[in-house]
């Protein structure tokens, strides 16, 4: 009898340790992905630092493909290990979710206008920095902001975030996750915690809502890309 009890206790300990290492591994994957994304920005925002002359474009393209591949596959690997909420299930495209993405795009425009009117005039430190970077990026700035940044940020702040936190099927978990995901997204864009953090927070929550409603990153990425593209029209 004692042997059975000990065995059950050991099994319980083993499960807890496995859960702990799984959780730690997912956090490490998210940190690695964010670090790769930040390093990739150097190729687009500060191309003059990459002293490769005529090989610069080829190296930039190659590094981009590798980074995006690694980040997205880390996300998919997390889903293979644990995916109770049913993310990234095929088929990936349908009219219902396209409709949600359209609603999300309209919402993000409304939230942006409302929040900007509430916080008042001015430009966030993040936007000021981006404006300066754009002057020296030699045409690569738009590619990063419109395509690569939304891809990487959605994988990390929506995909990986909901693989690590708020993983249980509860309505409170869903909305708390949307709020926290939005804040982390906002903090990355405004670490000085200025009044503009509320603008980014609102945008991040809309993108998190789109992801949670569609259960597919493709839709929040699409909304994010379309919103960022408006800045260049």
Task: Report the location of each language-model feature.
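N-terminal, membrane-interfacial amphipathic/helix-forming hydrophobic leader that caps
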Residues: 1-100, 106, 176, 232-233
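Residue-level signal for functionally critical sites in structured catalytic/ligand-binding pockets
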Residues: 2-3, 25-26, 30, 61, ...
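Context-gated lysine
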Residues: 6-9, 15-19, 76, 80, ...
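Membrane-water interface at transmembrane helix exits
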Residues: 38-45, 72-79, 112, 116, ...
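Juxtamembrane helix-loop-helix connectors linking adjacent transmembrane helices
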Residues: 49-53, 82-149
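Non-cytosolic membrane-interface motifs at loop->transmembrane helix junctions
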Residues: 50-58, 126-132, 196-207
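Transmembrane helix-loop-helix hairpins at the membrane interface
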Residues: 107, 138-233
